[in-house]
Amino acid sequence: MCTHSMITDTKLRKALGKKRDDIEIISDSHGLNARISQAGKISFFYRYRWAGKAVKLNVGDYPAMSITQARERRQQFRNWLTEGLDPREQVKLDKQTRQEAMSVAEAFNYWIERHCIANGLVKVDYYRQVFEKHIAEPMKNVKVDNTAKMHWINVFDSIESRVMAHYMLSLCKRAFRFCVNRSVIASNPLEGLLPSDVGQKPKKRTRRMDDDDLRKIYQWLKSHMSIESVFLVKFIMLTGCRTAEIRLSERSWFRLDDNEWVVPAGSYKTRVHIRRGLSDAAVNLVRNHLKKINTNHLVTSQRKIDGGIKDSPVHSPVASNYARSIWNGTGMAEWSLHDMRRTIATNLSELGCPPHVIEKLLGHQMVGVMAHYNLHDYIDDQKHWLRVWQSHLEEIIGEPFS
């Protein structure tokens, strides 16, 4: 039986779940209909013509879908028809898109693989580590396109460190922006949300070790910690290099007869080939260390596999803890390995080292016009001022640096 009055909520509520002798069809307008089965089940369907043939397309079930929602869906079907599209095909495509929609983890990994790894970014392991720690579990199996800003605010608010919350928002925002541009997710749920809305930037560090601090560090290294940790800290004390550069270093990076070492392009954030000088003490430090190890990497984990040391670099948090162990053990004020770079740069400046040489010693790229036209690495100047720094250190510790 078919009636042609408009569909109303009152009619449908009265008919819902009540048995009847015949199936009833209630027509609304512009092709929308409600079907009431003999068992009292109500469903919406849409009638239209395609290629000269009558078509009936399911819209949804009442009351899970309201009348308003059914009418909105009907309007979508009509719009598709106006555009020359068959609603049946569009419904299939919509369903496929929902089924293939990326989860938060899938979208993040897509960015890692298609952007970070493809472009040689070196902090990939760290990105994955912090994502697993702070985002993966609360957003487990959740589709990106199903998330809203409020969901993300709750996740970021649950991160204990406000600095890390600030960092994670920036990181995820970058990842999702890339995915939107590649059309693998529909929109960026973090668009418009500022890092300052959920956290704060890390405070600018000003820690500089004084002579007494440097003396304590050197004396502590004489009788504490593993050979890897002692080597890494001493090498940074002599060169001012980034922790990651020596942590990831391999035998082939060193040209000890020339008092040089090279950080290959792609091995750290600058992604350019960097040649650095070495003082005599640094050369001897490396030579002595190479005699003690049988791995390609100079700073490896102590974990043994099949009776041998695993030939892979120690992870960043492990290296960072080397400094913590020292200031905890000596009772010094807190400092980080990165503070050692600031200490060396400041001391060298006070000793008269030109700023451009300090920049090269630190592995920084030139800025402005010099970045484009001056590619000189001042290697002889680097070696000279590293010898000056070695002599200054030896005056502080009161003995040859070894």
Swiss-Prot record:
The region annotated as signal peptide is none
Q: Which residues form the active site?
A: R242, K269, H338, R341, H364, Y373
Q: Which residues form a coiled coil?
A: none
Q: Which InterPro entries match?
A: CB, DNA_brk_join_enz, Integrase-like_cat_sf, Integrase_catalytic, Integrase_DNA-bd_sf, Integrase_DNA_bind_dom, Integrase_recombinase_N, Phage_Integrase
Give the EC number. 2.7.7.-, 3.1.-.-
Q: Please list the residue ranges annotated as the Core-binding (CB) domain.
A: 102-180
Which GO biological process categories is it annotated with? DNA integration; DNA recombination; establishment of integrated proviral latency; symbiont entry into host cell; viral genome integration into host DNA
Q: Which UniProt keywords apply?
A: DNA integration, DNA recombination, DNA-binding, Hydrolase, Transferase, Viral genome integration, Virus entry into host cell
Q: Does the keyword Cell cycle apply?
A: no
Question: What's a single GO MF annotation on this record?
Answer: DNA binding
Q: Which residues form the Tyr recombinase domain?
A: 204-390
The record's annotation in Pfam families points to: Arm-DNA-bind_3, Phage_integrase
User: Which protein family is named in the record?
Assistant: Belongs to the 'phage' integrase family.
Q: What does this protein do?
A: Integrase is necessary for integration of the phage into the host genome by site-specific recombination. In conjunction with excisionase, integrase is also necessary for excision of the prophage from the host genome.
Protein's UniProt name? Integrase
- Organism source for this protein? Enterobacteria phage phi80 (Bacteriophage phi-80)
Q: Which gene encodes it?
A: int
